[in-house]
């Protein structure tokens, strides 16, 4: 490739070339050691960006130039953290706004980008200092561990099964709680909340089982009979529940690998998870499938407001609230 460039007459910046087990590349430090490739962004950059987000949230407006600079820094991080990308959309939209919103000339209301900035701040304060992601080299020599998560939800409960290398390793079944109903504003037994519960069971499963693949190459198949939940897993964006989408992105942002495969499974084929989600159906007729042994059942934390990092008051993170016009 280099010879081709030379033949074409392109000049090369040899002084920028690097070789070895540790190199710096467009703002990242990349090292190879002990069978791992580690990519990191220096703590000085991350600390400065954290303070920039804090100070921006204390203001009412931001200039276009300042917002463009902030978005550029956030985009630099999003290159390493895939789950940041959905939140970048809000910044790009503010920069490209075409309709008047009564903001002062050359400025943008902070309230129009506040939800993205607040999410960034939660992530940054949960993972302070140098941002690091690691990948094991030997995981690139084979397709990786194959894992599947079967999910289902009903207006009465939630169920999921984790399968690794074709072996069931964990499962859970839980009724919808008072906290679930209060936070997501649906009634128990009301089918109007079905898509919300499908998204919630995805979040719970990913939070529980993310450590299984956090730093490993894993072919993860998320199987559900609900297309909206699958779309959420694929894009980390949802019109159903912005809260669940933000929480899911926060979990995914802390993993080196994302689920690679999303699969729709007809309800009749999603038998185990379907049965688990309907254990509390007042019409009855559902039992725990025989293949799901009791010792593999895992406890699910209580899902009150403390379960959701993005529901914590911004005062807890040391950021002031912005106000609009």
Predicted regions: what they are:
Residues 1, 207-272:
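RNase H catalytic domain
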Residues 1-2, 30, 84-85, 94, ...:
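Short secondary-structure boundary/capping segments
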Residues 5, 27, 71-72, 91, ...:
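Mobile genetic element proteins and their domesticated derivatives, centered on retroelements
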Residues 19-138:
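C-terminal reverse transcriptase regions that engage the nucleic-acid substrate
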Residues 24, 28-35, 255, 259-313:
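C-terminal functional segments of enzyme domains
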Residues 55, 165-200, 228, 235-237:
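A short, polar/acidic, helix/strand-boundary loop motif
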Residues 78-80, 91, 159-162, 206, ...:
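A short acidic (Asp/Glu
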Residues 142-156:
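Two-metal-ion RNase H-like nuclease active-site motif
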């Amino acid at each position: 490739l280099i010879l081709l460039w030379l033949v074409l007459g392109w000049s090369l910046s040899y002084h920028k070339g690097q070789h070895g087990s540790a190199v710096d590349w467009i703002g990242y430090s990349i090292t190879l050691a002990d069978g791992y490739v580690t990519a990191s962004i220096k703590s000085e950059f991350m600390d400065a960006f954290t303070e920039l987000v804090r100070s921006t949230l204390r203001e009412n407006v931001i200039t276009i130039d300042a917002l463009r600079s902030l978005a550029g820094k956030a985009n630099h991080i999003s290159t390493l953290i895939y789950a940041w990308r959905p939140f970048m959309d809000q910044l790009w939209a503010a920069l490209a706004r075409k309709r008047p919103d009564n903001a002062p000339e050359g400025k943008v209301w902070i309230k129009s980008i506040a939800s993205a900035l607040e999410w960034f701040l939660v992530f940054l304060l949960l993972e302070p200092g140098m941002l690091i992601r690691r990948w094991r080299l030997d995981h690139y020599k084979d397709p990786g561990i194959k894992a599947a998560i079967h999910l289902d939800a009903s207006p009465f409960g939630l169920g999921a099964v984790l399968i690794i290398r074709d072996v069931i390793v964990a499962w859970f079944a839980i009724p919808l709680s008072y906290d679930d109903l209060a936070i997501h504003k649906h009634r128990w037994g009301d089918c109007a909340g079905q898509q919300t519960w499908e998204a919630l069971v995805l979040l719970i499963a990913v939070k529980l089982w993310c450590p299984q693949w956090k730093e490993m190459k894993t072919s993860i198949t998320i199987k559900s009979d609900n297309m909206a939940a699958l779309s959420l897993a694929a894009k980390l964006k949802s019109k159903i529940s912005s809260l669940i989408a933000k929480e899911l992105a926060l979990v995914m942002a802390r993993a080196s690998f994302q689920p690679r495969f999303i699969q729709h499974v007809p309800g009749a084929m999603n038998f185990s998870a379907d049965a688990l989600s309907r254990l509390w159906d007042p019409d009855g007729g559902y039992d725990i499938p025989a293949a799901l042994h009791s010792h593999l059942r895992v406890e699910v934390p209580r899902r009150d407001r403390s379960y959701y990092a993005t529901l914590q008051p911004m005062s807890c993170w040391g950021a002031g609230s912005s106000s609009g016009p």
